[in-house]
Amino acid sequence: MKFDPPLETVTLLRRYKRFMADVVRADGSEITVHCPNTGSMKNCVLGGPQQALISDSGNPKRKYRHTLEALQVAHGHWAGVNTARPNALVEEAVRAGQFPMLDSTSGVEREVKYGDSRFDLALGERADPHTFIEVKNVTLGPGPDDKDDGVIAFPDSVTERGQKHLQTLMDVVASGKRAVLFFCVQHSGATAARPADEIDARYGQLLREAIENGVEVLAWKSEVSAQCFRLKEPLPLDL
């Protein structure tokens, strides 16, 4: 996923009302941008001015023309905070054949229903996929006062929706189909991924149960820069 022109570097002043953020541009002007992230953004928004990257939709009629894409977080790392990006990154990589274990030759579909749930991606025919993929944006890294250990966690707040997805992924496996949970780790300091048991113990419990029941879990680190976002290397899962 290349950005041409590159993302604009600004200074984040504040995030508020969940979906809004105020930033200052290089010329000193202040604008409000869209913040597409429903999580707490713990250890991403640090509480004071910090470097950020924004994209421009090019649409002057949009209420908030610009979108918050990434933040410089503790220890000088960057985290991608636009939760719409991981789905596109994973789909792009699957279609490009980056993951031999996720063969796209039979087709790649978006937003596919299974029961009363909807998964981000599926492989095979839309009416009868053989593989369901749920993608998660993983950004919870160490804070400013924490050791920079490179272990990035999910979720950053209690997620009943995420818990439901894990239960449905287990149902998928029980039905004879393949289920994959893909942790897209948008954090430049990442060396491993883990469940954030201290935030959502139930999610961690269900994740381990899902793995025991045949759900496949992949974790990949994404490059986060003004020029491009791309999945670059697999990460170990610290359970």
UniProtKB/Swiss-Prot annotation:
Coiled coil: none annotated. GO terms for molecular function: DNA binding. Disulfide bonds: none annotated. Belongs to the SfsA family. This is Sugar fermentation stimulation protein homolog. It comes from Alcanivorax borkumensis (strain ATCC 700651 / DSM 11573 / NCIMB 13689 / SK2).
